[in-house]
Amino acid sequence: GLPCDCHGHTGTYWLNYYSKCPKGYGYTGRCRYLVGSCCYK
């Protein structure tokens, strides 16, 4: 995914995960967008 900013964290933008982040990456939070989510560790 593309890098993105979420609550001051640098995260990864996932286009295919609309409401949750993929498991197995150790993400601790996210920001939802109209399409996709920004997931950060």
Swiss-Prot record:
It comes from the Eukaryota. One of its GO terms (molecular function) is ion channel inhibitor activity. GO terms for cellular component: extracellular region; nematocyst. Keywords: Disulfide bond, Ion channel impairing toxin, Nematocyst, Neurotoxin, Secreted, Toxin. InterPro entries: BDS_K_chnl_tox (IPR012414), Myo_ane_neurotoxin_sf (IPR023355). It is found in: Secreted; Nematocyst. Disulfide bonds join 4-38, 6-31, 21-39. Belongs to the sea anemone type 3 (BDS) potassium channel toxin family. Neurotoxin. Causes paralysis in crabs. This is U-actitoxin-Bcs2a. It comes from Bunodosoma caissarum (Sea anemone).
